[in-house]
A protein has these predicted regions:
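Hydrophobic faces of well-ordered beta-strands that scaffold small-molecule active sites
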Residues: 1, 27-32, 66-68, 122-124, ...
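N-terminal, post-signal-peptide region of Sec/Tat-exported proteins
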Residues: 1-14
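Short, solvent-exposed loop/turn segments at secondary-structure boundaries
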Residues: 5-8, 39-44, 164
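Glycine-/small-residue-rich active-site loops that bind phosphorylated ligands and cofactors
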Residues: 8, 129, 157-158
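Active-site acidic/histidine proton-transfer and metal-coordination neighborhood
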Residues: 13-14, 19-26, 37-150
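Active-site pre-Tyr helix/loop in NAD(P)-dependent dehydrogenases
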Residues: 33, 72, 158
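Gly/Pro-rich active-site loop or hairpin
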Residues: 134-138, 142, 148, 157-180
Length: 180
């Protein structure tokens, strides 16, 4: 998980690779956080830049997939409240889900060239925000229609009708995060 890394210099990255190798572990998925659901162009650009940077880190670590997400409206400040509401939160006043999907799609499209150049596949996780449902994840992935943005399926994140939703995601799933 990127947020748990204490440093990002090359010697640290190579030490992580060495530790994984010595312990028989494959580094197969790099986990990051994005927040593209914002009317503020500067906020989206900051998250695009962060995503591009994380693609570079994944590449240096030899990791072929990187978990990405949409972000969320940010109108629910308390995580427990967000969970009580099953990840659903009110939109920012004056904005629509359609606008949010457009912002997310535009942002991921700006990351595709770097993902392809580095050979790191982005996997959009079924996480909170606009990726809370299989329909939301697939709306984004299918709109972009690139082999460099597919799906990371997280078994702990669908709160309703899990099997149907995983069945929908399966054809485009490149990575699974399994939880009990």
């Amino acid at each position: 998980l990127h947020v748990q890394m204490t440093r990002e210099d090359n010697s640290y990255l190579q030490m992580l690779k060495q530790r994984a190798f010595i312990n028989g572990l494959d580094l197969c998925g790099f986990s990051t956080h994005q927040g593209f659901v914002s009317p503020d162009v500067a906020v989206r650009q900051k998250n695009i830049d962060h995503t591009l940077h994380c693609l570079e880190l994944a590449y240096k670590l030899g990791i072929p997939t990187m978990r990405v997400n949409t972000g969320r409206w940010g109108t629910t400040k308390n995580f427990d409240t967000l969970m009580e509401n099953k990840g659903i939160e009110p939109r920012l006043e004056g904005h629509s889900d359609d606008q949010g999907f457009k912002w997310v799609i535009d942002s991921f499209e700006k990351c595709l060239k770097k993902a392809e150049e580095l050979g790191v596949m982005m996997g959009l996780e079924n996480h909170w925000g606009l990726g809370r449902t299989a329909e939301g994840v697939l709306r984004i992935v299918k709109a972009i229609d690139s082999p460099w943005l597919q799906v990371t399926a997280d078994t702990g994140n669908f709160l309703e009708d899990q099997y149907r939703q995983f069945e929908m995601l399966a054809p485009q799933t490149v990575y699974v995060q399994a939880k009990t």
